[in-house]
């Protein structure tokens, strides 16, 4: 029995080392998928396409909404419709950091939110879930205002 265990361990060890680099490559590909998805999600605002926005939101998603959570796709869609009402987008966003769990099933994206003049006014934090091959949907979202600390200290 010990000999069999020794043989199995001896065979498995080199294979474990081989599996790691391909997993890293998979995570890189998944990071790119999530980055591309976040960029496409943000384009819905620029393109004024509320229906496309809703398509990125998971059925059971929760948007934290400054401590007043919006629960479910329908509630989120109804609340966000106002941001798509005018001809010009009231804000834009883009990811500057994306990370994926080793399982490849959840990801986090964070980045700046800009006003129409391009000034950073907030940062967002989104959690994405892999719902099918190459299909990521947002399950949690939050944002927070950023401090313009330099100008406040200058006054």
Residue map of PLM features:
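N-terminal secretory signal peptides and thylakoid transit peptides that target proteins
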Residues: 1-12
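A beta-strand edge to alpha-helix "cap/lid" segment located at domain peripheries
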Residues: 6-8, 18-55, 62-155
């Amino acid at each position: 029995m010990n000999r069999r265990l020794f043989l199995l361990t001896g065979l498995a060890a080199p294979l474990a080392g081989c599996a790691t680099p391909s997993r890293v490559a998979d995570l890189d590909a998944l990071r790119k998928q999530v980055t591309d998805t976040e960029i496409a999600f943000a384009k819905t605002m620029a393109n004024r396409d509320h229906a496309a926005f809703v398509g990125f939101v998971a059925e059971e998603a929760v948007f934290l909404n400054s401590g007043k959570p919006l629960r479910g796709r329908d509630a989120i869609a109804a609340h966000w419709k106002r941001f798509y009402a005018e001809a010009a987008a009231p804000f834009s966003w883009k990811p500057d950091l994306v990370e994926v769990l080793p399982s490849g099933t959840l990801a986090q994206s964070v980045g700046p939110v800009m006003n129409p003049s391009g000034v950073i006014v907030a940062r967002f934090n989104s959690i994405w879930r892999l719902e099918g091959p190459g299909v990521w949907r947002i399950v949690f979202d939050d944002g927070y205002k950023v401090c313009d600390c330099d100008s406040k200290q200058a006054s």
